[in-house]
A protein has these predicted regions:
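The Walker A/P-loop phosphate-binding site
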Residues: 2-104, 117-121
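Residue-level signature of catalytic and energy-coupling elements of molecular machines
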Residues: 38, 53, 94, 133, ...
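Catalytic phosphate/metal-binding cores of nucleic-acid and nucleotide-processing enzymes, i.e., regions
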Residues: 52-55, 75-77, 180-183, 221, ...
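Conserved inter-motif catalytic segment of the P-loop NTP-binding fold
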Residues: 57, 68, 76-169, 173
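Phosphate-binding/switch region of NTP-binding enzymes
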Residues: 159-292
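Long, well-ordered amphipathic alpha-helical subdomains in the mid-to-C-terminal portions
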Residues: 280-310
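Terminal-proximal interaction/regulatory segments of ATP-powered molecular machines
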Residues: 300-335
């Protein structure tokens, strides 16, 4: 015979009872990314109090997307930190994406142990958002404690698995430290690697299986570097306008999510030159509105909810970019 919740709790030790409750009211705050389409797939954004993995091919703007997300978080009064192991952080580039470097905590980390020490310290200090760029560049501390000859001797020993073991322990310690002071969003950036153990070559993130296991969301970003996939625009050189590459299309794939339905995908435009730098939030909003059926398209013509027709995607994006009220209306209807 089953007992009620109240009867079960009444039989417990009073100290233990204080730590228990029911499943009502367990909610998370979400940090929006700069992509409206990705936010919609995530159920609002990335969850605070959780670990998130963003990985993919080089030049897929993983770091830049995270910098734009930091800019959004700073605008909401959040305290953010950047742990840099690639030594690729640029103050000028961060500013161009909307980040306030004066309000950004910055730290370098060579080893996995360094990252854990800094990460736990930042969580205990009450930092809201931490980005690690990237875990691919980090090494176990053992590589810095041995000289070259000793490392050669270690290549054929169990130390060859030190990286995966250290990462596994790192995620345990960081997840244990999280939520003690406040829920911190921990974002891990990883480059893609070839899995040579499979029958066919496949891509996977760094850090071993534990990295994905401890991540509440796994997002893959990828893009093509081919010339025909590049976004081109007119760049003024002297008194002439020359057509050059100004951006590329970035595809995203929500491979796994504990807080929303996974296995969703989409794409957005990313610009590294020109008048608009970074992820094109307006273009992303327009594409999401079309996919959701809020905006109809017939051939090259787009039909707005008020019946107005606009020709071409670029023309429609420019129309929405200039009309802030229309932007807000689309966002509200898509939320």
């Amino acid at each position: 015979m089953s007992v009620s919740l109240e009867e079960a709790l009444a039989q417990l030790d009073p100290k233990l009872r204080k730590k228990l409750g029911n499943g009502v009211g367990v909610a998370y705050e979400y940090q929006p990314t700069p992509s409206f389409g990705l936010n919609k797939a995530l159920g609002g954004g990335l969850p605070y109090g959780r670990q998130v993995l963003i990985w993919g091919s080089k030049s897929s703007a993983k770091s830049s997307m995270c910098l734009q997300m930091i800019a959004l978080a700073q605008a909401e009064g959040k305290l953010c930190a950047w742990i840099d192991s690639e030594m690729s952080y640029s103050e000028d580039w961060a500013r161009s994406l909307g980040v306030d470097p004066e309000k950004l905590i910055y730290s370098q980390a060579r080893t996995i142990s360094d990252m854990v020490d800094v990460g736990v310290g930042l969580m205990n200090a009450g930092v809201d958002l931490i980005v690690v760029d990237s875990i691919t560049s980090m090494l176990p501390a053992i590589y810095f404690e041995k000289d070259t000859d000793e490392m050669k001797a270690l290549e054929n020993t169990k130390q060859i698995g030190a990286e995966s073991r250290d990462f596994s322990n790192a995620w345990k310690m960081l997840n244990y430290a999280n939520n003690k002071v406040k829920p911190t969003l921990l974002v891990l950036i990883s480059q893609s690697r070839n899995n040579i153990n499979a029958m066919y070559t496949s891509q996977q993130p760094s850090g071993g299986q534990a990295t994905k296991f401890y991540s509440s969301c796994v997002i893959k970003l990828f893009s093509s570097e081919s010339d025909n996939q590049a976004i081109k625009g007119k760049i003024k050189v002297g008194d002439k306008l020359i057509e050059e590459k100004v951006g590329r299309k970035i595809k995203w794939e929500l491979q796994f999510s504990k807080t929303s339905p996974g296995f969703q995908s989409g794409e957005y435009d990313f610009y590294f030159r020109g008048d608009s730098i970074g992820l094109d939030t307006v273009g992303d909003l327009v594409d999401t509105a079309e996919l959701s059926g809020l905006v109809e398209r017939t051939g090259a013509w787009y039909l707005l909810p008020d019946g107005t027709k606009v020709q071409g995607r670029d023309g429609f994006i420019n129309r929405v970019r200039e009309d802030l009220n229309l932007q807000e209306d689309l966002r509200k209807k898509l939320s």
